Amino acid sequence: MPKKCRHLLQTSDLSLDEIKLLLKKASVYANDFNAVSLETKEKMHNKIIVALFFENSTRTVSSFEIASLRLGAKIVKLNMQTSSASKGETLTDTFKNIHAMQPDAIITRHAFSSAPFKLAEFSQCPLINAGSGVSAHPTQALLDLLTLYQHFGSLENLKGKKIAFIGDVKNSRVANSNIKLLQRLGLEIMLCAPSSMLPTTSLKTTHNIEEAIAFADILMSLRTQTERHNAPIFASLKDYGNAYCITQQRLKAHAKNKEVIILHPGPVHRDIDIESAVLEDERSKVLEQVKNGVAMRMAVLEFLLLD
């Protein structure tokens, strides 16, 4: 019989109690990355984690690597451009070969939404989805939740808060994972984008950024995923920015909550997604999200490998 283990493929894999546990542990690490217990370091010392990223990444792959090392584990990053995948080896065969080497966990990112679910069917070690197509990016949603949890003080305080997602919602796995998670926690959600960037949904939608800003306590800006577009939607990114950039002027004129906070999963297109002045504003939580990425991924790895 195959050994049973926990995977993190989507946020619904976690119960509310488990999410609270991760928030508690990640909060400790966010306050002090060195707050790893000696017992945890000893248990993680011989753990080997493999990162299989079939799509480019800066923040996610780096924070998983740093998280692994801070816990005391070792991480192997496979360069897909120089691996046998570039010679025509299938995703499944690449995964099975790495899996046969018996790592303690595998972190994967792939352009196909179904990829991690397919691989999890025969994985006998914890599998973490670090981004799959347009469907899911669970650790990003968890680190974003940690950022909101820190700002508002508790999950109870988050209930009823209003968040607007602005940008390419349809093609954003970050938005998809966040929406599913935040709905569970009682937040009110609005999507703001041109028609071609909006999914079919029962959620509130608008094409008007001013309306979204007026609605929100939290603004989540999303980049335009041009690599997933079949045809240009705007003549240029500048034209898109003219319609959907979060600017100081727009915040001043339309934000009903003057303490509205701004998030972005990165990479940020400066002065297209968010105006540079807004990124430097104290209401911007973008770099806090990056820091929290390490803390939350430390908590996730510890949870899956040790608990």
Curated annotation (Swiss-Prot):
Originating species: Helicobacter pylori (strain HPAG1)
Pathway named in the protein's UniProt entry: Pyrimidine metabolism; UMP biosynthesis via de novo pathway; (S)-dihydroorotate from bicarbonate: step 2/3
Single biological process term from Gene Ontology: 'de novo' pyrimidine nucleobase biosynthetic process
Binding site for L-aspartate: K87, R173, R223
Binding site for carbamoyl phosphate: R59, T60, R109, H137, Q140, G266, P267
EC number: 2.1.3.2
Function of the molecule: Catalyzes the condensation of carbamoyl phosphate and aspartate to form carbamoyl aspartate and inorganic phosphate, the committed step in the de novo pyrimidine nucleotide biosynthesis pathway.
Cellular compartments per GO CC: cytosol
Superkingdom classification of source: Bacteria
Gene that this polypeptide is encoded by: pyrB
Catalytic reaction(s) noted: carbamoyl phosphate + L-aspartate = N-carbamoyl-L-aspartate + phosphate + H(+)
Protein name (database record): Aspartate carbamoyltransferase catalytic subunit
Family: Belongs to the aspartate/ornithine carbamoyltransferase superfamily. ATCase family.
Keyword ATP-binding listed: no
Keywords associated with the record: Pyrimidine biosynthesis, Transferase
Quaternary structure and partners: Heterododecamer (2C3:3R2) of six catalytic PyrB chains organized as two trimers (C3), and six regulatory PyrI chains organized as three dimers (R2).
A Gene Ontology molecular function term of the record: amino acid binding
NCBIfam families, per database record: asp_carb_tr, PRK00856.1
